[in-house]
């Protein structure tokens, strides 16, 4: 029984973000479709070859996506919303981009599909839309074409396909309500057709991803798996693939399925390998997800070996990444500026492939010397002085309940804030960032590379902040922001100014479409050596009589959007960040900043996948926010912002944050998110986003007014704010000016009644 290895997927964007650059060039009309397709082909060929060279036996094919793999699956099934369809009914790459972005080089612009987080990761997928009586057919053969490409290159191919039940679970019904699970029988023939095509090509194994099987699914959804897989059996061997949690609670459902293998995440799940081995059918292959696909830490391979060795030789076994390596940067070897000791603690996607090769070889041979050698640096880290800061640990231990309480209740604070700011009804503001123009990015890059001295850099940033204030005053906004010209990223910026974080040069991971992020890495205890945002906030406030918001990223979001340590709890990391940022709130307040926004867009996405684990997480997540904010005086208005959220099931926790104002992303969901706030009788102020910043389309005054009137039916008008869905960093100035002008006009119209 020779053990093989495989990965569940590989990063798509390219080491130098080649895919991002090609996409954006094509969207801007600066390159042809054929040039874009060529970049995709080159990246796929390179990535397959890199995995093969690193020692991977079975290469994932079908993990590449032009925007998002769930959207690719929608096109595969012919699930294209009517507003995005080509007039002749055909499907092409621009169809895909219209669903994702709302527009493409061809076809009519239309509202983009809703976007939300992929399980509890920082990757986003485009939510499939389902309507009653919908028909499905195989229309987009990208998977088959890529399999042909890989076969032509003589690779050992393992196609990757998002499973039918998870696909339906991830979608939403549009229009007349019905049970989307009823569409299962309509999509299965397309899956059968795809599997038949793969069988024709001589494919032995197909990785069919059903991550919904790690959730606490309703019984009807669990019951759907057996008939679905009865329909799919027989053409190729199916590796039923789960990740992000364990499968033990749903194992009875899984073992009844006619598949030939199961992949389990042995990093994030609590499944016991020996117990799994006992309960799985004896002829099934077990794919053991031992290498963390979601983090950047070098694995202790001696531990991984010990975790799996008891079942070696007792059944067919593969070793694998826990999930797709999509969530990890590509290659550590190009990081030339990392300190050697710190660098020795990390492994990126290619290094993780090497770990899988080492593990496979040791399990096949019984020789563990190479594992011990590989694991030595991560074992040495446990005693490093870079990791532990006694002062931080002491302050954390001394936190009391009082540290997370504002001095007075919201009603008392609201009165003090009204007296201080004297804002009109329907007050207008933005979420924080303004367009990051080429000039701004060049300025920051030149400074970073040493081509620009500190004085000239500061003068340049000050000019952009001044311009942002002038633009906002001209537009007539009520509460201003400084525009964040000095910030590369809302998390990276804070990480750069806090001790306990390190940064990479090329550690990019895909967030959605062409958007990539370079998450900071938490390597040790976190503290704030000096004020971070005070100087620029103070400067911006000196330019205007209107209030300017101080802008902070909240502790849970910094945690969720960083690569965390694995040796302490997430709660510990969040509270260390909260204490550091608490000092920032006090300093902003002392500098005369009266409105401070603490963004927590990631609060909901940090939720554990199983509801039974939610309460503990929400308790410390809310406490971290409150520790951060509670130092503020009554007449300091604390705002928070949240994105892509379903709030109804966590409204208690949203209210418990006790922010004076919450702004939320609602435009893509047509204000339906406000139902939660209405039903809960949310007591504080709220700014429902009135237009989608992910799309370049400019909303009309009438459209915004209609949304606000809809909002006022649910929330008393005197507690409503008017704002976009999110920050405007990724937009251009022309559409930003036009959209904000319409937003301000809509608010003014409503004030006049």
UniProtKB/Swiss-Prot annotation:
It comes from Shigella flexneri serotype 5b (strain 8401). Catalyzes the transfer of a methyl group from 5-methyltetrahydrofolate to homocysteine resulting in methionine formation. Pfam families: Meth_synt_1, Meth_synt_2. Binds 1 zinc ion per subunit. Zn(2+) binds at residues 641, 643, 665, 726. Belongs to the vitamin-B12 independent methionine synthase family. Pathway: Amino-acid biosynthesis; L-methionine biosynthesis via de novo pathway; L-methionine from L-homocysteine (MetE route): step 1/1. L-homocysteine binds at residues 431-433, 484, 599. It catalyses: 5-methyltetrahydropteroyltri-L-glutamate + L-homocysteine = tetrahydropteroyltri-L-glutamate + L-methionine. This is 5-methyltetrahydropteroyltriglutamate--homocysteine methyltransferase.
């Amino acid at each position: 029984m020779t053990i093989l290895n495989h990965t569940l997927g590989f990063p798509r964007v390219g080491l130098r973000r080649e895919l991002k650059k090609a996409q954006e060039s094509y969207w801007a009309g600066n390159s042809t479709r054929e040039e874009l397709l060529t970049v995709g082909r080159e990246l796929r060929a390179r990535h397959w070859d890199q995995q093969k060279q690193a020692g991977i036996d079975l290469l994932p094919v079908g993990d590449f996506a032009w925007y998002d793999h769930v959207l690719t699956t929608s096109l595969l099934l012919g699930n294209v919303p009517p507003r995005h369809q080509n007039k002749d009914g055909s499907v092409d790459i621009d169809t895909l981009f219209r669903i994702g972005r709302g527009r493409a080089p061809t076809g009519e612009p239309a509202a983009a599909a809703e976007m939300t987080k992929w399980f509890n990761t920082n990757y986003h997928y485009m939510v499939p839309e389902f309507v009653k009586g919908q028909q499905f057919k195989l229309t987009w053969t990208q998977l088959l074409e890529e399999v042909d490409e890989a076969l032509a290159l003589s690779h050992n191919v393992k196609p990757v396909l998002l499973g039918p039940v998870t696909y339906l679970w991830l979608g939403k019904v549009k229009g007349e309500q019905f049970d989307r699970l009823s569409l299962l029988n309509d999509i299965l023939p397309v899956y059968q057709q795809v599997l038949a095509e793969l069988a024709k090509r001589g494919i032995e194994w197909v990785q069919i991803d059903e991550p919904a099987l790690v959730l606490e699914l309703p019984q009807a959804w669990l019951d759907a798996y057996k008939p679905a897989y009865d329909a799919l059996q027989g053409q190729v061997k199916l590796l039923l693939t789960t990740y992000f949690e364990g499968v033990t609670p749903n194992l009875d459902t899984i073992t009844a399925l006619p598949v030939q293998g199961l992949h389990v995440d042995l990093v994030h799940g609590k499944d016991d390998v020996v117990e799994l081995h006992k309960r799985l059918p004896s002829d099934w292959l077990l794919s053991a997800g031992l290498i963390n696909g979601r983090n950047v830490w070098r694995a202790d391979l001696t531990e991984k070996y010990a975790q799996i060795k008891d079942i070696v030789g007792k059944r067919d076994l593969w070793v694998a990444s826990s999930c797709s390596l999509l969530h990890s940067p590509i290659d550590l070897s190009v990081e030339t500026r990392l300190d050697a000791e710190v660098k020795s603690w990390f492994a990126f996607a290619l290094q993780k492939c090497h770990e899988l090769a080492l593990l496979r070889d040791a399990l096949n041979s019984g020789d563990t010397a190479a594992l011990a050698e590989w694991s030595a640096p991560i074992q040495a880290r446990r005693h490093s002085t870079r990791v532990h800061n006694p002062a931080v640990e002491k302050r954390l231990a001394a936190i009391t309940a009082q540290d997370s309480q504002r001095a007075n209740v919201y009603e008392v604070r609201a009165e003090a804030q009204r007296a201080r700011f004297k804002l009109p009804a329907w007050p207008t503001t933005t979420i924080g960032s303004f367009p990051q123009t080429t000039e701004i990015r060049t300025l920051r890059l030149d400074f970073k590379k040493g081509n620009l001295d500190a004085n000239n850099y500061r003068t340049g940033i000050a000019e952009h902040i001044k311009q942002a204030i002038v633009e906002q005053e001209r537009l007539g906004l009520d509460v201003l922001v400084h525009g964040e010209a000095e910030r590369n990223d809302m998390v990276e910026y804070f990480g750069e100014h806090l001790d306990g974080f390190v940064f990479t040069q090329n550690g990019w991971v895909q967030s959605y479409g062409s958007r990539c992020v370079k998450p900071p890495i938490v390597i040790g205890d976190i503290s704030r050596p000096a004020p971070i945002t005070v100087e620029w906030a103070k400067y911006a406030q000196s330019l205007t009589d209107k209030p300017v918001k101080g802008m902070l990223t909240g502790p849970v979001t910094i945690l969720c959007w960083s690569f965390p340590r694995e040796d302490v709890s997430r709660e510990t990391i969040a509270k260390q960040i909260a204490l550091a940022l608490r000092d920032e709130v006090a300093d902003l307040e002392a500098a005369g900043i009266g409105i401070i926004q603490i963004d927590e867009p990631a609060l909901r996405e940090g939720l554990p996948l199983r509801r039974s684990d939610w309460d503990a997480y929400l308790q410390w997540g809310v406490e971290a926010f409150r520790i951060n904010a509670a130092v503020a005086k009554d007449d300091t208005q604390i705002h928070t912002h949240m994105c892509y959220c379903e709030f109804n099931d966590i409204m208690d926790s949203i209210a418990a944050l006790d922010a004076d104002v919450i702004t939320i992303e609602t435009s893509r969901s047509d204000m339906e998110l406000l139902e939660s706030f209405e039903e809960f009788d949310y007591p504080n102020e709220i700014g429902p986003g009135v237009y989608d910043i992910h799309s370049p389309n400019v909303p009309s005054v009438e459209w915004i007014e209609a949304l606000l009137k809809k909002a006022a039916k649910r929330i008393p008008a005197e507690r409503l704010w008017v704002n976009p869905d999110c920050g405007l960093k990724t937009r251009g100035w022309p559409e930003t000016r036009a959209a904000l002008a319409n937003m301000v006009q809509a608010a003014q119209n409503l004030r006049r009644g």
